[in-house]
Amino acid sequence: IIKSVAKICVYGNGKSYFLWNNALAYYKKLNHLFEDIKSDTPKDYLYPCFITLCSATLEYSLNLIYVLYCFRHFEYEDYKSYLETYRNMCFKNKLFMFPYIISEGKLIINEDSQEIKSLYELITKRNGLLHNSEKLRTFDVPDINASIINDKLVIPSENSQIHILLSAEDNIIDSITKDDCIRIGNVIFSFYKQILHPYVNDDELNICDFIKSKN
């Protein structure tokens, strides 16, 4: 089990610091939702909720990794400056850069792995859910041989009715499936076991399904 208190530093200057770790709270709630989704009863309304919680859990995990890295390697004054830089990266870049930063250039993300591809897909779905909006779309109007006579629009009787077919695009909230959730959920829990748990508890980051050697 991952430690709740990730780091404590005691200094003789009257100031001491500790770093609290709430990752387990995220993963516990995610696991409860995961079990509901895997059940036989269809619950498609939970799918977008699951994707949102998965992305929140992943980003919290990445932020915790960066916080721990800065806490372990920099004095408090420098820690804040470095951490601000890392936390201001976009979500995908946080994922892409963390093994290179943590390992000081020895490890990189394995973009060929299905695990990383699933995490990239998760981020894309999350962005689609949380930042979705509608846009104007074009359609073709058939020629109805209309004319202007005495400042009035005149349409031939045979064209008084026209049929226009409007095609709708798939909405992200309806496109998420149970299989998507199960696949992405399994990857998130693998991230916990292979990366977050060993790094938080033992300060270790190793080659795994998500990470490969730079060379």
What residue ranges belong to the model's regions?
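Amphipathic alpha-helices that form helix-helix packing interfaces
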Residues: 23-26, 30, 58-64, 122-129, ...
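Glycine-rich, flexible loop segments associated with nucleotide phosphate handling
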Residues: 42-50, 86, 116, 149-157
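Short, hydrophobic, well-ordered secondary-structure elements
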Residues: 44-69
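Flexible secondary-structure boundary motifs
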Residues: 63, 67-151, 164
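Amphipathic, Lys/Arg-enriched alpha-helical patches that create a basic surface
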Residues: 123-128, 141-215
